UniProtKB/Swiss-Prot annotation:
Naturally occurring in which organism (per UniProt): Geobacter metallireducens (strain ATCC 53774 / DSM 7210 / GS-15)
GO molecular function, one term: N-acetyl-gamma-glutamyl-phosphate reductase activity
Family: Belongs to the NAGSA dehydrogenase family. Type 1 subfamily.
The UniProt record lists the keyword tRNA processing: no
UniProt pathway annotation: Amino-acid biosynthesis; L-arginine biosynthesis; N(2)-acetyl-L-ornithine from L-glutamate: step 3/4
SMART domains: Semialdhyde_dh
EC number per UniProt: 1.2.1.38
Keyword check for Transport: no
Protein known as: N-acetyl-gamma-glutamyl-phosphate reductase
Length: 346
């Protein structure tokens, strides 16, 4: 049995981790921390976990956490993670970090979009945790930087086209829509019910969203050269889910049937990527609560552009589910273990 800790469990990602880990037959959750709710029972903070988690939330004391767990999930905000991750590693613990702190290859990029990185030594050793790209490296990693939700949906949507050199990389436009849980659980006026209900708005417009450098880093590695994209996120009045519509000019085949066949072959054997038949596009309703990424394709013959639509649950494949998938790879468990639940519908 693998003993794990969830650090920063009072947010949406934290509770999603607890939900998924409860169903994992090889895992025991031995420590759960929350600075905001320390001293309160887990079920008092998250009634959905009542009668399943009897622990009391603890303060974050890194040495004590490390004494209780072999693997530590850090579900903390950026900067807060890199304040504790070095201690966990020094004490011989493996870490899956769900913040942005260990996703980048270059600390200068992190500094440009966030702030100066306090732990560049471990940043260099961290493995970007998108299993469909880095499965082998994840298996040997001591520190995995779990990908962001938007990057997961965009990278998986574009990977076959870039690897097969079928698009002009300079023409990529990604238009993504997210449920409100993507903004976190903290109280913010702009996320109140009356602010988001019956509304649909863009944000981070003009190339300023912090997920842009993460997307560009991974797409550039796939393409073998620097890529700059146009990316605009939107907030939609639903709890969870991300739908990304991605456009690029084709340089190869414009047959939808051939592109669908290419994607199906490329992702053959990937347990969580589902390529839809030609003429079908995904819906967030069909991946809700699951670790799936659904992908559909179309071609606009008038403009010579391919349209890729990808759907994920931002809290599962976009966060906690992917973290559990990475844990499975790190410890040699079946990759789907604890993640085999079907999407919730309706």
């Amino acid at each position: 049995m693998l003993n794990v800790a969830v650090v920063g469990a009072s947010g949406y990602t934290g509770v999603e981790l607890l939900r998924l880990l409860y169903c994992h037959p090889e895992v025991a959750v031995t420590c759960i921390t929350s600075e905001q709710s320390a001293g309160r029972p887990v079920a008092a903070v998250f009634p959905t976990l009542r009668s399943r988690y009897t622990q009391v939330l603890e303060n974050l004391e890194p040495v004590k956490v490390a004494q209780k767990a072999d693997l530590i999930f850090t579900a903390l905000p950026h900067k807060a993670a890199m304040e504790v991750v070095p201690t966990f590693l020094e004490l011989g613990k493996r870490v899956v970090d769900l913040s942005a702190d260990y996703r980048f290859n270059d600390p200068a990029v992190y500094e440009k979009w966030y702030e100066p990185h306090m732990n560049p030594e471990n940043l260099k050793e961290a493995v970007y945790g998108l299993p469909e790209i880095r499965r082998e490296k994840i298996g040997d990693a001591w520190l995995v930087g779990n990908p962001g939700c938007y990057p997961t949906s965009v990278i998986l949507g574009l990977m076959p086209l870039l690897k097969k050199r079928l698009i002009d990389p300079s023409t990529i436009i990604a238009d993504s829509k997210s449920g409100v849980s993507g903004a976190g659980r903290g109280a913010k006026v702009e996320n109140l019910y009356c602010e988001v209900n019956d509304g649909f708005k863009a944000y981070g417009v003009g190339g300023v969203h912090r997920h842009i450098p993460e997307i560009e880093q991974e797409l550039s590695l796939l393409a073998g050269g620097p890529i700059t994209i146009t990316f605009t996120p939107h907030l939609v009045p639903m709890d969870r889910g991300i739908l990304s519509t991605i456009y690029a000019r084709l340089t190869g085949t414009d047959s939808v049937a051939e592109l669908v066949k290419l994607y199906a072959e490329f992702y053959e054997g990937e347990p969580f990527v589902r390529v839809l038949p030609a003429g079908n596009v995904p819906s967030t309703a069909h991946v809700r609560g699951s670790n799936f990424c659904d992908i559909g394709l179309a071609v606009d013959s008038r403009t010579g552009r391919v349209i890729v639509v990808s759907a994920i649950d931002n809290l599962v494949k976009g966060a906690a589910g992917q973290a559990v998938q990475n844990m499975n790879i790190m410890y040699g468990f079946p990759e789907t273990m604890g993640l085999e639940g079907l999407p919730l519908f309706p």
